[in-house]
Curated annotation (Swiss-Prot):
Chain's role: Protein S19 forms a complex with S13 that binds strongly to the 16S ribosomal RNA.
Family that this chain belongs to: Belongs to the universal ribosomal protein uS19 family.
UniProt-listed GO biological process terms: ribosomal small subunit assembly; translation
GO CC annotation: cytoplasm; small ribosomal subunit
Designated name of the protein: Small ribosomal subunit protein uS19
Keywords: Ribonucleoprotein, Ribosomal protein, RNA-binding, rRNA-binding
A Pfam family assignment: Ribosomal_S19
Entry GO MF terms: rRNA binding; structural constituent of ribosome
Gene that specifies this protein: rpsS
Length: 87
């Protein structure tokens, strides 16, 4: 279910402030996976925490409006079962 338009997009205030003062090429570490990507974030790199490590996410124009957490998966896919003994 989408967020109500009257509420507007959500972004963590601290994250927005960090992004404003960050230099180009600097990785901005964040735990706020729920924050919406704003147009001001284009060209910046965020280190999004996935529960184990910070995944670098370089923001492009296509990502605006999505959440930061969408680009840092939390689960590792081990693949489907291998049939090692089967011929």
């Amino acid at each position: 279910m989408a967020r109500s338009l009257k509420k507007g997009p959500f972004v963590d205030e601290n994250l927005f402030k960090k992004a404003e003062v960050a230099k180009d090429g600097e990785v901005i570490k964040t735990w706020s996976r729920r924050s919406t990507i704003f147009p001001e974030f284009i060209g910046k790199t965020f280190g999004v925490y996935n529960g184990k490590e910070f995944i670098p996410v370089y923001v492009t124009e296509d990502m605006v409006g999505h959440k930061l957490g969408e680009f840092a998966p939390t689960r590792k896919f081990g693949g489907h079962g291998d049939d090692k003994g089967k011929k």
